[in-house]
Amino acid sequence: MTIRIAINGFGRIGRNVLRALYESGRRAEIKVVAINEPADAAGMAHLLKYDSTHGRFDWDVRQERDVLYVGDDAIRLLHQKEISQLPWGDLGVDIVLDCSGVYGKRADGEMHLASGAKKVLFSHPGSSDLDATVIYGVNHQQLQSEHRIVSSGSCTTNCIIPIIKLLDDAFSIESGTVTTIHASMNDQQVIDAYHPDLRRTRAASQSIIPVDTKLAAGITRIFPKFCDRFEAISVRVPTINVTAIDLSVTVTNAVSVLDVNTMLQRAAKGDFRSIVDYTELPLVSIDFNHDPHSAIVDGTQTRVSGKHLIKTLVWCDNEWGFANRMLDTTLMMARIGF
């Protein structure tokens, strides 16, 4: 059975989801029937085809009025600003991938359902009353057919939570801290301009900029036992894609660098192979651009202090890896039934 999906919001994640669908060869399983985006149709087609981060999309893309063609596939373009006005029922939409970055409350998901969708998947952390938050590769097996309003978490939770799980299962984590070294985002300024967050009033290309993060809360949502045992900070750096996460954890079991790297390398070759990768090559951030894994461990940067303090450096393409996990989760939501 082919799943009929709609994408609500055709920004960075929405476009990457569509592109990842075509590049990953999953079109037999997922069909995009509609995209809702307030922007004009010509701009939507142009930005799908030509991307400053991921390069040209290697499919024929054209737009005729409010229809986007990718190859021979026709996708209806909508420009509604209110979820309640979206014709998901008329279009036979099974799952809405809400990539707007605006919506994330249960009431928002319920509006998608009222408009005729069978299920909703948010591309960002949602409110605590959603049916589930899924970090694919860690807890996706907990999805149930009655889970209709679901969140995919964030790019950073998808990156770090698999590593936390692996370290905890192997060495028993007691507590931890996380520093996210994140590429610039579109909520920052090109040149100095007003923003409610005074640090984000400053030009993104000129500074390393500390920003607030709810990553610690995201970790606790997946692993309640770590409540009050993880803290996180985040800085934005002047690159347009790929994020590094510095994870430090104290563990119960005595370990060495070799112990940690051997375990992570085995996981990357085993059950986590599509989620986690491992490298000891002397790479830099741009080398991980367009990498579909949620997390890539840089084994050259692993450190152990006093046998119980582990520091790891983990890379992720914060757009492409996350877009691929959204597709994985979409397929899982369909397989368990409507």
Swiss-Prot record:
It is an enzyme of class 1 (oxidoreductase). Keywords: Cytoplasm, NAD, Oxidoreductase, Pyridoxine biosynthesis. SUPFAM superfamilies: Glyceraldehyde-3-phosphate dehydrogenase-like, C-terminal domain (SSF55347), NAD(P)-binding Rossmann-fold domains (SSF51735). GO terms for molecular function: erythrose-4-phosphate dehydrogenase activity; NAD binding. The keyword Oxidoreductase applies. Pfam families: Gp_dh_C, Gp_dh_N. GO terms for cellular component: cytoplasm. Its EC number is 1.2.1.72. This is D-erythrose-4-phosphate dehydrogenase. It comes from Tolumonas auensis (strain DSM 9187 / NBRC 110442 / TA 4).
